[in-house]
Structure formats: C-alpha cells, structure tokens
Amino acid sequence: MTVGLNGFGVLLVMVVALALAQIAAIRERAVRDPLTGLYNRRYIDESLPGLLELDERALVGLALVAFDLDKFKGINDTWGHDVGDKVLRRFAQILADCARRTDLPCRMGGEEFVVFLVEQEIDGVAIFAERVRARTEEIADIAPIPAGRITTSAGIVLRHRGEGLEEMVKRADRLLYKAKENGRNRVESADSIEADPAQVESG
C-alpha cells in the first residue's frame, strides 16, 4: 500500500496534532491539584506575573483571598482521611461555583486555598469571601460529619503597587490568622491588629 504526498501530509498533520494535544494534557495535569481539580501553586507561579504587570499598568485591580478550613485536622483524626478528602473536594467546588470567569481559585496545599480576583474594591472581594464562608457553613451532607461542623476562615487584601506574590500572600495570611484568633468561621479584611501565627491554635 502506498501513500501519496497529499495523504502523507494529512497523516503528518494528524500526528503533530495528536502530539501537541498530549503535551497540552501533560502540562494541564502538572498545574492541577489531583484531588480537587483546582490549579496548584506551580500554576500561580507561572501565571501571576502577567496579572501583576496588568495591575502595575492600572489595567486591572488584583485582590487575594486566603481561605483555610477550620480545625480540619480534627476532621481527619475523627472521621478519617477519606472523609477529609470529600470535604476538600466539596470546598473546592464551592470556590469554583462562587468564582467568576476572571477569578482564579487555587489549592496551595492541605486545607489552604487562595483565590485571585480581578477587583479594585475591597467590598466586592468581601462579598465573594462571605458567600464562600456561608456556603461552607451550610454543608450538611458529608456523613458522618454533623451539620455546621465544616467552616472556613478567610483573609482578604487588595494588592499594593509594586507588591510581589509572596508579600501579598503574607498579608492575606496575617488576616487569616486574625480571623482564626477572633473565633474562626469569619472573614477579616483590615490590617489593624495582626495575629501572630505561632500563637494561634492549629486549624
């Protein structure tokens, strides 16, 4: 059987297209958290420089919400890691449901999540964070966890001009620890009184 030049060209295009699709799939898996399907820290490191540049040029405003599931270690210790994984997947789904197409929810690791928002007003960020908090508190169908046991705390910040990713995350984390210190299951957005992470009970 012989293949003409036209047939060979079509075959070559198909092989190249398949190879490119496989490469794209491999890269996509590398930047996705395997448990929740959200983007991971690697994706943040690769993608955020572009957003930071747009923010510097005042084309967009950039905000960050840091979330942490309250007393999550107790969930794993009491009901096991399989149940804990269900909680993580459900929380990730809540983030995805509440996020807009321009927002970027990511899992940093463990029970820690962040969401980057194209937003210039703190009130808009607070509305998003409070919606996530309320939806999380309403989870009542992950047996055998009782209703109301699953909650999240959050810290929200707007990016300062010239601020890098690490600095932005640290500010959001300080507010997150403040939320934990003030009773958990709450959103903090003011830098006034910052909690020392070392003094806050785990979770």
What are these regions (language model features)?
Residues 92-93, 124-142, 173:
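Alpha-helical scaffold within the catalytic cores of cyclic-nucleotide enzymes
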Residues 126-129, 157-203:
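Catalytic-core segments of nucleotide cyclases and related cyclic-nucleotide turnover enzymes
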Residues 2-35, 42-53, 103-104:
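Signal-transducing coiled-coil linker helices
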Residues 27-46, 58, 67-81, 89:
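Conserved nucleotide-binding and Mg2+-coordinating catalytic segments in signaling enzymes
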Residues 27-28, 41-61, 92-100, 118:
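Short regulatory alpha-helical coupling segments
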Residues 83-104, 112:
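Active-site-proximal alpha-helical element of nucleotidyl cyclase-like catalytic domains
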Residues 97-102, 134-146, 176-178:
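Short catalytic/binding micro-motifs of nucleotide second-messenger systems
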Residues 104-107, 148:
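A short pre-motif secondary-structure segment
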